[in-house]
Every structure is written in structure tokens, then in C-alpha cells.
Swiss-Prot record:
The keyword Ribonucleoprotein does not apply. It comes from Rickettsia akari (strain Hartford). One of its GO terms (biological process) is D-alanine biosynthetic process. GO terms for cellular component: cytosol. The gene is alr. The keyword Isomerase applies. NCBIfam families: alr, PRK00053.2-3. This is Alanine racemase. Disulfide bonds: none annotated. Keywords: Isomerase, Pyridoxal phosphate. One of its GO terms (molecular function) is alanine racemase activity.
Length: 355
């Protein structure tokens, strides 16, 4: 077990959920808990959100769905965003998982298993309105409109789409996608709809439809949401170095003065990117401390020379992620996004869930 502690504030996640629910008003709000709840624990987060009446949980794969179903029981809907494949269709049926069907081939597979089981099988349809990732194409949607037998045997519960640039509120592409989505929905007047991801919720009620599907905003990856994550690491080694001493692999940092250098027990094997070498920072008692030298697999060095002497001791905790250094802020240093910071968090951390 790592000496580092990853604290996940469940109350903050629940408060974020309730804030989003308040914005959505009459629309339902689900939760994207794929990639193990963005690295924070899908089961723990889902159980907490169930207490706030969340009933829709979105995962990426059937494996994620099965694990969640085993933990949560049958009282919630679990949606598999990557859809259904020949090899996992029976597993989806056994564990009451609902696939989001992304193309005619997946519809065909699900229809085949509906015939085998002699019953309707639940599904969502994903219409591609412009993100051009997953989703039925315009030609495929037209085929569905003209031949409803293509959906025979399927219990179509929702039609969804996904916004490509919802974090940019004024980007006209959002409205373009909305209008395309609405045009398709006219042909399915009795089917519920879902469009808004986290950013989409903040675009206004026109984007909310029947169900919103936030992920990032639940986990604090939005300026108005509360950060629920704190990652701390203790100082495990201290050394006094003289002027012109080299630090770390390839000697990429050289001291410009007599320095006190501390070592922390985490590295790129724990999801702390090598790109932070010589440019990241941590915080000790609210004071910024620079990272010096290369990030190693299991270790990083920090320059604590400017800290008060009483703050420099073995076991002193440094905050890697927290209110001083949120995932979004950290991500901006190395040109990535907060999603990647969270989902990269390694399995060695001691995870503590607090209310």
C-alpha cells in the first residue's frame, strides 16, 4: 500500500449532483461513472448518489456494468455507452444492463438476442449529431425512420446524443447539434431524449430534455463545482545539497544555491505525469513548493528551501491535488484536461472516503 493518501469527499460529489439537479429542474439527472467513476470509485460514488435519488448510471463497457450491478442490485438503470457486441450480449441480459446502440450492426445483434429470448430487450439509441465518434449516422437514422421493423423486439427507452464542445457556451456548434437532434426526435415523438453532458447542463433548459448525463461536473471538473479530491504524500527523505548539485535522472535540474530537497513517494507509475518534471508544484501548509528534477516511476523531488524550518520534517504532508491545486489547474500546467488527471490516478494510493 502506498504511503500516499487519496481522499474522496463524497459529500462534495453529492452536493455537486444536487446543484446540477437544481439547474435541471424537472429533468432527471443521471451520473457518468465510467472509468471507475473517473478514477475515484464507481461503486462508492454510485451508492452515495442513490441516496440522492439518482437512478441512471452510465458506464463504458459491459465489464464496468457487471461490476456495478453486483454492487448496486437491481433498483437502478445501468447504461453501457459502448453498446452491445456478440461476445457480451448474454452478459448484458443476465445482469439487466441496457446497451446504448451506436450503429445498425448493434441494433441487429440486440434484435437477434431479443428473438432468442422471446422478449423485448431494453435499449437506448445514440444519434450522431456532430461529435463524429459513436452514434448512428444520418443514413442509418433515415433507415430507422423509414423501416420501424428494424427496431422490432426492442424496448426503446431513450434516444441520446452527445455534445462536442459544450464547455464553450457561446460556440454556435452547440445550437447546430441541438437543432439536428430536435429534427430527428420529431420522428420518435413517444421516446424520451437525453443530450446534456456536464457542459450541456449549463447551456440552458433547451438542452436538458428528459435526462442529463453529467460526469466531469460531479467530480469538480468545472469552475463552479466543488473539488472532491485531495491527494497527499509524506516527505520520506530530506537532504541538504550545495550549489551546483544535480537532481534526478539525466541531471535536468541543478541547484542555484544551497538547497533543502525533499522526496515524496509517488511518480509516473501512480499517474503523476513525467510532464510535471521541473514545472509542477505541490503545497505544504498552503505554500507553493516547486518540483525539481525528473519525475521518476515512484518518486518526485521538491525544493523546500524557502519553507519555514518548522515545516520541514520527515512525515510532513504535501498536497498534490486539493483546493490549492485542483485537477483542472494541474492539467493546465502540462496541456491536458482534468479528466485525464483523475482517471490516471494509480491503484496504489490508499483511498479514503469521507462525508
Amino acid at each position: 500500500m502506498s504511503l500516499c493518501t487519496l481522499e474522496i469527499n463524497i459529500s462534495a460529489i453529492k452536493n455537486n449532483y444536487l446543484l446540477l439537479q437544481g439547474i435541471c429542474k424537472t429533468s432527471l439527472v443521471g451520473a457518468a461513472v465510467k472509468a471507475n467513476g473517473y478514477g475515484l470509485g464507481a461503486v462508492q460514488i454510485s451508492k452515495a448518489l442513490i441516496k440522492e435519488n439518482c437512478r441512471y448510471f452510465f458506464v463504458a463497457t459491459s465489464e464496468e456494468g457487471v461490476n456495478l450491478r453486483k454492487a448496486l442490485g437491481l433498483d437502478v438503470d445501468i447504461l453501457v455507452l459502448n453498446g452491445v457486441f456478440e461476445h457480451d450480449a448474454l452478459e448484458l441480459i443476465e445482469y439487466n444492463l441496457t446497451p446504448v446502440l451506436n450503429n445498425l450492426k448493434q441494433i441487429e445483434i440486440w434484435q437477434k438476442f431479443s428473438n432468442l429470448k422471446h422478449r423485448l430487450l431494453p435499449c437506448y439509441l445514440h444519434f450522431n449529431t456532430g461529435i463524429n465518434r459513436l452514434g448512428l449516422s444520418s443514413d442509418e437514422i433515415e433507415q430507422l425512420i423509414n423501416d420501424r421493423d428494424l427496431l422490432k423486439g426492442l424496448d426503446l427507452q431513450y434516444i441520446i446524443s452527445h455534445l462536442a464542445i459544450s464547455e464553450e457556451i457561446d460556440n454556435p456548434y452547440n445550437l447546430e447539434q441541438l437543432n439536428i437532434f430536435k429534427a430527428y426526435l420529431q420522428y420518435f415523438p413517444n421516446v424520451k431524449a437525453s443530450l446534456a453532458n456536464s457542459g450541456g447542463i449549463f447551456l440552458g433548459q433547451d438542452y436538458h430534455f428528459d435526462l442529463a448525463r453529467p460526469g466531469a461536473a460531479l467530480y469538480g471538473l468545472n469552475p463552479v463545482m466543488k473539488n472532491p479530491v485531495t491527494l497527499k504524500a509524506p516527505i520520506i527523505h530530506l537532504q541538504n545539497l550545495t550549489l551546483d548539485s544535480h537532481i534526478g535522472y539525466n541531471m535536468t535540474f541543478t541547484t542555484k544555491r544551497d538547497s533543502v530537497i525533499a522526496t515524496l513517494p509517488l511518480g509516473y507509475a501512480d499517474g503523476f505525469s513525467r510532464n510535471f518534471s521541473n514545472q509542477g508544484e505541490v503545497f505544504i501548509n498552503g505554500r507553493s513548493v516547486p518540483i525539481v528534477g525528473r519525475i521518476s516511476m515512484d518518486l518526485i523531488n521538491i525544493d523546500v528551501t524557502d519553507l519555514p524550518p518548522l515545516d520541514i520534517f520527515l512525515g510532513q504532508e504535501a498536497e498534490i491535488i486539493g483546493n490549492y491545486c485542483t485537477p483542472d489547474k494541474i492539467a493546465s500546467i502540462i496541456g491536458t484536461i482534468g479528466y485525464e488527471v483523475l482517471t490516471s490516478l494509480g491503484s496504489r494510493y490508499k483511498r479514503i472516503y469521507i462525508e
